[in-house]
């Protein structure tokens, strides 16, 4: 049975895979992206191009005003993006306080207005140690809340919650996906840096899968 679902779609490889998984499952997909003032805003351009190509309804919502009260992240503030492997100590500076709770809340509101039954988002196990709002206990409790917060229950669904980025890429390749249509780098430059934690984790996923990353790097 076809269901309406909202997919939180950043333009990165995880949410790109989630978007395509929802489509291949036959759902009526509505993609939702957020401009929260991230320096890697190029991901939104990539997301728009993909949705146009797939003929998926897509909204980009500007919520950058939240930075008037939320700060301290290297993704939004004038703080250097850490280089090196994707590890807790170095990557903590990339945390945007309460980001996923904000994004999920807005996505659930959109889902209710569309009469959609689920919100898909791309949390995965590689993020558990670093980002509290990607951990299973957070996803479960958000799901519990979103089932009772409105007259119409909405399920929070994270298909790769217990999988690594390596697993996500493996699944995406099996689906025939083209990862040149994604953006991962946290630095807001024309080409991916290849040095930040996000790039390092992406490159590792391709290496383990015996594949060459189609993106150009500096």
From Swiss-Prot:
Which superkingdom? Bacteria
NCBIfam families reported for this sequence: 7-cyano-7-deazaguanine synthase QueC
Role noted for this protein: Catalyzes the ATP-dependent conversion of 7-carboxy-7-deazaguanine (CDG) to 7-cyano-7-deazaguanine (preQ(0)).
Cofactor stoichiometry and binding?
Binds 1 zinc ion per subunit.
Positions with a binding annotation for Zn(2+): 185, 193, 196, 199
Organism of derivation = Pseudoalteromonas translucida (strain TAC 125)
Cofactor(s) named in the record: Zn(2+)
- Similarity remark: Belongs to the QueC family.
Q: Supply the name of the protein.
A: 7-cyano-7-deazaguanine synthase
Q: Which InterPro entries match?
A: QueC, Rossmann-like_a/b/a_fold
Q: What is its EC number?
A: 6.3.4.20
- Keyword Nucleotide-binding in the entry? The reply is yes
* Pathway given in the UniProt record: Purine metabolism; 7-cyano-7-deazaguanine biosynthesis
* Molecular function as annotated in GO: ATP binding; ligase activity, forming carbon-nitrogen bonds; zinc ion binding
Q: What are the GO BP annotations of this UniProt entry?
A: queuosine biosynthetic process
Where do the annotations place ATP binding? 9-19
